[in-house]
Curated annotation (Swiss-Prot):
InterPro entries: Ribosomal_Su5_D2-typ_SF (IPR020568), Ribosomal_uS5 (IPR000851), Ribosomal_uS5_bac-type (IPR005712), Ribosomal_uS5_C (IPR005324), Ribosomal_uS5_N (IPR013810), Ribosomal_uS5_N_CS (IPR018192), Ribsml_uS5_D2-typ_fold_subgr (IPR014721)
Assembly and binders: Part of the 30S ribosomal subunit. Contacts proteins S4 and S8.
GO biological process: translation
Domain S5 DRBM: 17-80
Cellular component, GO annotation: small ribosomal subunit
Protein's organism: Gloeothece citriformis (strain PCC 7424) (Cyanothece sp. (strain PCC 7424))
Entry protein name: Small ribosomal subunit protein uS5
PROSITE patterns: RIBOSOMAL_S5, S5_DSRBD
Family: Belongs to the universal ribosomal protein uS5 family.
Amino acid sequence: MAKRRKSSRTKEKETNWQERVIQIRRVSKVVKGGKKLSFRAIVVVGNETGQVGVGVGKAGDVIGAVRKGVADGKKQLIEVPLTKASSIPHLTNGASGGASVIMRPAAPGTGVIAGGAVRTVLELAGVKNILAKQLGSDNPLNNARAAINALETLRTFSEVAKERDVPLEHIYS
């Protein structure tokens, strides 16, 4: 009888993903027999080397909700361009719902100066030096999504030079 090898597709690549739960909330749905309770988890997934995603999971128990949130976060991954100083290349803004976020690059040694969900997103993205401010809503999900939105709009100096058809040295001067 021939031995079957496990497919490499089924085995998930382990590249030290970290996950942090931002919020777990008990939610209810009104049905004919009364209220049906479930849990909603907001999870940030990142590898601290420039990839990060925010996911939301709902299940009857907390562990199931977190597991679904992690899976959703891995589907929503974005690439974040980091500088040599582990900061962002330029100032950026992001918005989601009523929340808006402003991010500014910072000098080495500054640290992550941000609050709440935005701080978690930036730390798991691998940003070490940044100044960020949340404006508007204090909803953790909208703030996390606003942070992701701001990080998505970032461009490297080489991308800008290519778009403008100028040499990279011209951008720095």
